[in-house]
Amino acid sequence: SVFADFHCIDTGIKHGTVTVVIDGEPLEITTFRLAGEYEDTRPPKRVTFTSNLGADLGRRDFTVNAMAYSKMTETVDLFGGQNDLKNKIIRCVGDPDRRFNEDDLRILRALRFASALDFEIEEKTAQSLLKNCALLGNISEERIAKELLKLVCGKGAKRILTDFAPVLFEILPELQPMYKNSHDNPHHCYDIYEH
């Protein structure tokens, strides 16, 4: 009833998620929830709804995605998301290794957000995603393709594709021989990968 005047899409109703279209912009609205057990680095099949906002926000992937809004208290930001948003930083909530091992797709989501928003990836988060990039082998090609397409269309794509090339080599190993491999041509100043 809160969004009765808006177009709503049941995008994940069994997980408590609906998409509300406001002024042409789709916004995901989610009920407070706790995740079940992560199995094989995949999101839990079951969630438990909760009234504990802090517990819900603490299981989110990145600080910029771990904020909430309340009419009574306005923005609820327990993990520094507003500061990271202002400073254009992608940072995991809590331990990056834990976040990426809970859901491998978060590795590509970090790169995609950094590319789309032209943000930097915080150092511990960057080190962890490079260390854990082999987890990407667990993700379906369709899910990888969806994230990769959004990544390459971002404002910061060139920087992300260059700085995090080893992550891409996990999903597109054909690119690795091009990296740091010159054209042997005086008219090309870039290596084959960068070109």
Language model feature labels by segment:
Residues 1-195:
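Catalytic cores of the polymerase beta-like nucleotidyltransferase superfamily
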